[in-house]
Amino acid sequence: DVRDIEKKLRGETFIESFSVKKIYPNTLKIIIVEKTPIAILQNKKKKYFISNKGDLINYKDVEAYKDLPIVFGGGEDFYSLYKELKNIKFPLEMIKSFYFFESGRWDLIMYDEKVIKLPIDDYIFSLKNFLLSKDNSNFKNYKIFDYRIKDQLILN
């Protein structure tokens, strides 16, 4: 029954949209558009994917998505950070994980083990500053870029 199929498809969080058409006498044409995961949210003991539109998708072990960055906490705040990162053309493929703190700020852990400690406010300025300095030879040996104190960069 077409309604049963539609009900099952609606319950699947990976599906963005779908259409089901009955072609008589005995054929169904089903078109499914999947959501696109951008990160894995680790929320306490549960895992979800976060889609490119900010939706939560029930986690499944999918080979194609195993290397997505992991978000620890702050799932509802992550999407706005993600959009800002895209807007400033931050190289998202460099980010291994995101850590959200209850104070309302983020740490970004990069694949090269560099850590960017962002302030609560005006973190776009800090991210742009990191983009300008990350390839500078004077900054190569530093692993921690701490922007938490306004108008200061603490390197470690």
For each of these PLM feature ranges, what is it?
Residues V2-N156:
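Charged, solvent-exposed interaction patches on well-folded alpha/beta domains
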